[in-house]
Amino acid sequence: MWKKFIPYALLVPQIILGIIFIAGLATGITQSLGVIPAFGLTEPTFKYYKEILSRPDIVKSIIYSLYIAVTSATLAVLIGVGMCAVLVMNTDTKGKGMRIIQLPIIVPHVVVALFVVNILSQNGLLARLLCAMGFIKEQQDFVQLLYSTNGVGVIIAYLWKEIPFVIYFVIALMANINGSLGEAAINLGASRLIAFMKVTLPLCRRAIGSSFLIIFTFALGAYELPLLLGPTSPEALPILAHTQYIHPDLENRPYAMALNGIITIISMICAVAYFRLMQKNTEILNRRKAKKEHNEKK
């Protein structure tokens, strides 16, 4: 009898976490609309959204955050897929090489920021090496990569973390397709490159799109790297939201929640797009499975 309740018991932790998440999300949404009874704010309004979207500094922060997220996600996908292609066409998708590539995935972002500062700052290893070799006269002549408004330091840190993620996310599917349909195209006369570009890569586009959405959403809402490596102005949206949240005037809280609301809206759009990609993948797999079963019956 107890065996019937085991599946439901296993769902309890997920249900608890789901309730906490939904409660927090609902609280954030209501506060972003100006409903905080403890502060004497009881009427919902879009005033806070309108005010933050009309402030030039916040608009710059939104543009900066989108720029960091889009650039890092795009470059990570392009470089990651390119490395996947090299590994797959050389049939080197397992072994020590892949383990080394996957190592950055488990490294915390704070540690990555420390690495980047020690290597790419004007007092870092690279600046010292170039100065010692005579390429630059002084360490201060080294190009300013960190804390600049172009966000190069933040993007480099994201690339170091996210390129291995793209490889890990895509390479299994790419290797499987290239080993079956890609080889079939080669046997029919296509070159290895043409087979990859015309057969393997198009069939991986949904997995590649999914990896882009995951990286974009994470980079948009991440706090550590923009804080440690980014400029003081414009600030990334998560930093700006935290600054507003800890403001001494508690009536400033709705502004922080409105900024979080913008991040949430963009993230939800990405989540819906990701769900649609996964749904299409499932439909394709089901059709292939049904077709295979039909052929076997014949």
Predicted segments, located by residue:
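C-terminal transmembrane helix and the adjacent membrane-cytosol boundary/short C-terminal tail
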Residues: 34, 171-181, 254-298
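Non-cytoplasmic
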Residues: 24-34, 166-169, 207-240
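Membrane-interfacial helix termini and adjacent extracytoplasmic/periplasmic loops
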Residues: 113-159, 229-233
